[in-house]
Amino acid sequence: MELGRIGVWWSGSWRAAGDADHNVAGELESLGYGTLWSSGGFDPGLSSRFGRLLDATERATVASGIVSVWTAAPADVGPAVADLEARSGGRFLLGLGASHSSLVPGYARPYAHVVEYLDALDALDPPVPPERRILAALGPRMLELAAARAAGAHPYFVPVEHTARAREVLGRGPLLAPEVAVVLETDRTRALELARQYAAIYLPAPNYTNNLRRFGYGDADIEGGGSDRLIEAVIPWGDADAIARRVHEHLTAGADHVCVQVVAGFEKFPLDEYRALAPALLGD
């Protein structure tokens, strides 16, 4: 499956009425972004959400980043994936993840639950084959599972050091597609303010903080909204050229594809920012 080097990570919170999804997706494709990632989260329905994005595009891959294995039953996901694949000529990639204990009642044995979920996808008729699915993965065991049972890994909220480590664990071949949030803002104070608004969603989650600790970030970095050191490592900011340099560091470190999520507040989808970033991100 061809993802291109740079894609867009599109929060499910931007689900809009009418033709808004359709128009935005079509323009992002026309700008040259190779894959449109949208969070599936806790919505059990795949066909309507991702079908709109596929119908709005002609070439771009559309990927779920991610669908929770706790809320979307394999028996429902399998037919939905088959439908999306058929209507798009094979342009849909199923992203799956174990979510977080704070969001899932009865959360237990997440690794084992993901394994069981993949077993169930394999047992469907037709199955969802490994090459059509990708796993949200941070730690070594989930990365190894992503290499063995899926097309690869889709890490989220990570510094570039994680991308390098993930490539070592995955080895050559499996897909590595990290999400990288960015702030298109040259004023450092304002950029860090926006970055912290975004980080506040994720710093309370042990999955993310435990992963950051593997790379030398301690309590002083994680508490209080995140230290400048941590925030700037995970969330690049600056003008388009500065952001492109930081995004391309992930490609140099071993990523095959980077999903760029523009952080610009919560008022509207940041289409203007994606337009401004496209020449620097997508140019040779």
Show the residue positions of the predicted features.
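Active-site-adjacent structural elements that line small-molecule/cofactor binding pockets in enzymes
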Residues: M1-D284
